[in-house]
């Protein structure tokens, strides 16, 4: 097999890998995202007939399969729904919103530090919304009991009283409800200065009989959420329950489950919902066993729910009993999740971020990138620095590869002579070439090793850029204001001079996301390939000539931070190869190859 053929096959393989990855991670998910948007539009166009039923209605309590739910509600705007019930204001350094006194729900949470877009007047991210709105999403907790007990327990329409009007990190709020039958319920809600609520429930039994209750906590989400739709990212139900490992259940998957329910038992853990950057999850007492459940109900408008049911709590006459649970509602900041795991002992809470199967590569990559960022103050510059660091780490292997390539160039006359001598005997020609490689101690495929080496780093960095909120809306310089998003410029509308967005064109829009940085990347790849002489075979020559163009179109939809990494890596590779070739006494043919290419273009 010819050396050029080996390189061609490797190049084709790498190109196919990227093409498949592009289709899997980008083209397919865009179609899925459009499908999800259509589902949501259909849901919103229908009358909301699904009951606002929570865990109170069907938690598996001994002796009871169903508790009364709520009546259907008319869909309201978010401001109307918030004004319909008395509330306790929520105000922390990172959150604002309110606690609903009707039902004692946490159903109004927005994030102070995060906005929908990079525009200064962009709305804050709204995480939780009350029942009755187009997309209810809320957390709840309390107690259930067997139906035969005949106990009057707080429901979603129960009106609680509060001892203060504003909940802050310095001032917890205590809610109280007296059922008029000898049971008094107290719920103290505290919140830290980040995203964690602590719910401490206490029940006073003033009757003359013991009372048995089962504590629960839940997060409920009505309607099918629109997800980012990327296979590289999990969005949906998620949790760690005891020793059952990380559970990631998509909305499609739970719909296909028998009875649309999955349950697990264990001690310690958490469960809830995760989006790309945000999450709402409950964490029961880490020392108490519980049953965690993921479920879907409803037909017209699905209701997704994650809930935790604790063991029986028996309260003696005149006694007091209680339960504690936590609610995380906020941004999936890496350090914040690590702190909650370490300080609160929440089991594997850092897995709320989808680091993927290559956690052992992706997580260290983020740590290095974030450490550099803390020094340089810009994630784009940190990406440039980590590229240099990776080059330094793999320099010995890359050095051997480039030296092998330099030797290949040095023996080009001998290779050409052998091919001419044995032009009619391909087997003999190949044998003589392999003998020449062996005699000169050359690895004929070593030239592709640098590209193979950077593939794991490429995908690890891609994962970091895509899933970590620290990269969201992180600027670089100039027009790059979000390293986690594609380059906003586009050559097909003359970089904004023409009033249309080519990426919105049906069928071909995904291929037209060619901005300035993808173009620079294509040029850098073109220069890198011109470091080597053109293959003699016309087919191989055309293949290598088109590779920079193909990669430019494919990487156009990738996060701009990744394109910047690839561009800088190509540039460093050209410089590194030039230095190594000069040290080996081999002429650097970049300029000659470029001039040869342009002269041929001019002649044609």
Curated annotation (Swiss-Prot):
It comes from the Bacteria. CDD domains: 5TM_YidC_Alb3, EcYidC-like_peri. GO terms for molecular function: membrane insertase activity. Residues 42-84 are annotated as: Disordered. One of its GO terms (biological process) is protein insertion into membrane. It holds the Pfam family 60KD_IMP. InterPro entries: Membr_insert_YidC, Membr_insert_YidC_N, YidC/ALB3/OXA1/COX18, YidC/Oxa/ALB_C, YidC_ALB_C, YidC_periplasmic_sf. It is found in: Cell inner membrane. The chain crosses the membrane at residues 8-28, 349-369, 375-395, 449-469, 507-527, 546-566. GO terms for cellular component: plasma membrane. Keywords: Cell inner membrane, Cell membrane, Chaperone, Membrane, Protein transport, Transmembrane, Transmembrane helix, Transport. It is a multi-pass membrane protein. Residues 43-58 have a biased composition (Low complexity). Interacts with the Sec translocase complex via SecD. Specifically interacts with transmembrane segments of nascent integral membrane proteins during membrane integration. Required for the insertion and/or proper folding and/or complex formation of integral membrane proteins into the membrane. Involved in integration of membrane proteins that insert both dependently and independently of the Sec translocase complex, as well as at least some lipoproteins. Aids folding of multispanning membrane proteins. Belongs to the OXA1/ALB3/YidC family. Type 1 subfamily. This is Membrane protein insertase YidC. The lineage of its organism: Bacteria, Pseudomonadati, Pseudomonadota, Alphaproteobacteria, Hyphomicrobiales.
């Amino acid at each position: 097999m010819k050396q050029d053929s080996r390189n061609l096959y490797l190049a084709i393989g790498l190109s196919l890998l990227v093409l498949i990855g592009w289709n899997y991670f980008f083209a397919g998910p865009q179609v899925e995202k459009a499908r999800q948007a259509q589902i949501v539009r259909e849901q919103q166009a229908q009358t909301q007939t699904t009951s606002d039923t929570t865990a109170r209605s069907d938690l598996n309590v001994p002796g009871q399969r169903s508790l009364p739910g709520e009546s259907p509600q008319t869909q309201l705007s978010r401001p109307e729904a918030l004004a319909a019930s008395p509330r306790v204001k929520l105000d922390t350094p990172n959150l604002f919103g309110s606690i609903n006194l009707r039902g004692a729900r946490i159903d109004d949470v927005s994030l102070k530090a995060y906005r929908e877009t990079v525009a200064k007047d962009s709305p804050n991210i709204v995480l939780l919304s009350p029942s009755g709105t187009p997309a209810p999403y809320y957390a709840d907790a309390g107690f259930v009991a067997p139906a035969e007990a005949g106990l009057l327990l707080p429901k979603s329409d129960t009106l609680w009283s509060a001892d203060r009007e504003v909940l802050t990190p310095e001032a917890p709020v205590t809610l109280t409800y007296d059922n008029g039958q000898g049971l008094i319920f107290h719920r103290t809600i505290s919140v830290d200065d980040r995203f964690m609520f602590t719910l401490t429930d206490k029940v006073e039994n003033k009757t003359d009989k013991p009372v048995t209750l089962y504590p629960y906590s839940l997060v409920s989400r009505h309607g099918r959420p629109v997800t980012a739709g990327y296979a590289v990212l999990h969005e949906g139900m998620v949790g760690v329950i005891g020793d059952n490992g990380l559970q990631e259940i998509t909305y499609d998957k739970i719909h296909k489950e028998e009875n649309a329910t999955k349950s697990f038992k264990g001690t310690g853990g958490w469960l809830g919902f995760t989006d790309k950057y945000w999450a709402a999850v409950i964490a029961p007492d880490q020392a108490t066993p519980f049953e965690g459940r993921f479920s879907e109900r409803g037909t017209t408008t699905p209701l997704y729910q994650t809930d935790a049911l604790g063991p029986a709590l028996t309260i003696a006459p005149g006694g007091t009993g209680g339960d504690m649970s936590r609610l995380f509602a906020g941004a999936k900041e890496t350090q914040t999740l690590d702190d909650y795991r370490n300080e609160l002992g929440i089991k594997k809470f850092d897995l709320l971020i989808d680091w993927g199967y290559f956690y052992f590569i992706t997580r260290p990559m983020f740590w290095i990138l974030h450490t550099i960022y803390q020094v340089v103050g810009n994630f784009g510059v940190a990406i440039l620095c980590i590229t240099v660091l990776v080059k330094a780490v793999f320099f010995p292997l890359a050095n051997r590869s480039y030296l092998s390539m330099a030797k290949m160039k040095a023996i080009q006359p001998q290779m050409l002579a052998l091919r001419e001598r044995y032009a009619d005997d391909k087997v003999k020609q190949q044998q003589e070439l392999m003998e020449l490689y062996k005699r000169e101690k050359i690895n004929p495929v070593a030239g592709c090793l640098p590209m193979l080496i950077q593939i794991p780093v490429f995908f690890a960095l891609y994962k970091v850029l895509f899933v970590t909120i620290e990269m969201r809306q992180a600027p670089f310089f100039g027009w790059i204001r979000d390293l986690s998003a594609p380059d906003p410029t586009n050559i097909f509308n003359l970089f904004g001079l023409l009033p249309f967005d080519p990426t919105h064109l049906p069928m071909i829009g995904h291929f037209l996301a060619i901005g300035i940085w993808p173009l620079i990347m294509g040029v850098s790849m073109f220069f890198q390939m011109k470091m080597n002489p053109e293959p003699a075979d016309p087919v191989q020559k055309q293949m290598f000539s088109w590779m920079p163009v193909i990669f430019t179109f494919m990487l156009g939809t990738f996060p701009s931070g990744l394109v910047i990494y690839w561009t800088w890596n190509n540039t460093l590779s050209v410089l590194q190869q030039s230095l190594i070739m000069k040290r080996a006494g081999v002429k650097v043919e970049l300029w000659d190859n470029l001039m040869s290419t342009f002269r041929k273009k001019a002649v044609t």
